[in-house]
């Protein structure tokens, strides 16, 4: 018999700061961290969506963690970061003041809560570390069904051609051209 026990599994997180609070998302969901760029407002989107950005030709909604978690609103600053991550088949961005580090959290330091909603706070769990707590966001639960529907409609409206225009290529016929 062996006295050896398997090491508990660890979860790799990207930790970041929003409104003085420490959050994290599982590293497997993260695509990249980019410098803050102008966030275009998205009419019709839920308040938890700050707007949209263009990431290499892809329109990406920016989730507003401050609104979702009841933190003070802070204007976009050039030093801020946008964490792009996958939630299901949608690429989203999280606006944060700064990314802190990559951390491997042992299972013993994790308290999984499932998709717990504390008021409007959606968390996948809490990582208890010697230097403090990291709130682990649950990206799939970040938007409720009504918010997801509103975001889908707002994105569809934003990608539709302006009213009164044609999608036909080539523009209007030239003057004097026969039809």
Task: Identify the function of each model-found stretch.
Residues 1-179:
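An acidic, low-aromatic, low-complexity terminal/linker signal
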């Amino acid at each position: 018999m062996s006295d050896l026990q398997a090491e508990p599994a660890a979860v790799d997180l990207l930790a970041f700061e929003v409104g003085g609070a420490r959050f994290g998302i599982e590293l497997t969901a993260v695509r990249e961290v980019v410098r803050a760029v102008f966030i275009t407002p998205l009419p019709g989107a839920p308040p938890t969506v700050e707007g949209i950005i263009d990431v290499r030709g892809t329109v990406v909604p920016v989730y507003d963690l401050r609104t979702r978690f009841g933190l003070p609103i802070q204007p976009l600053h050039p030093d801020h970061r946008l964490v792009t991550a996958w939630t299901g088949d949608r690429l989203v961005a999280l606006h944060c003041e700064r990314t802190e580090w990559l951390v491997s959290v042992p299972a013993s330091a994790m308290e999984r809560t499932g998709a717990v909603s504390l008021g409007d706070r959606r968390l996948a769990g809490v990582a208890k570390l010697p230097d403090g707590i990291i709130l682990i966001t649950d990206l799939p639960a970040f938007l409720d069904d009504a918010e997801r529907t509103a975001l889908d409609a707002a994105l569809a409206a934003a990608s539709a051609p302006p009213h009164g225009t044609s999608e036909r290529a080539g523009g209007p016929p030239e003057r004097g051209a026969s039809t």
